[in-house]
């Protein structure tokens, strides 16, 4: 669909509509990120699509693991083997900018950018953490959880992006998240 992956039954309904007869709703997705796809057809397992389970986690169980060169290749002629690796495959409808750095600089910068965009008539979304939420002043502000909890951040990511799509958000500013357990996902 080109949209962020479904994390709730209603997302599946939006994406697939009348193409399926039934949806079994087991609640929200536990992780909220794409699944890791690993190719076991070669001697050394190869990650075809990074997801929650990163290379280091897999190597603890499998030994040596390669990463498909197409995943990180800057050359557009080197294609990844797995689905879901195209440039905008899981992108939200809105333009997304991630602001990295020290939080005492990131927060005022996001507030400034969001205010500029709102002044220009754009609907703005902000992705932050529980720790910084109260410091944001402009836009549809959504917390992704506690900064130290990789799993919570992973769980909420696609759901927040889809919420912004549903709300008609045109520009998203997000804090950067240091989430080593999420790997390249």
What kind of region is each of these model predictions?
Residues 1-185:
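Active-site-adjacent structural elements in enzyme catalytic cores
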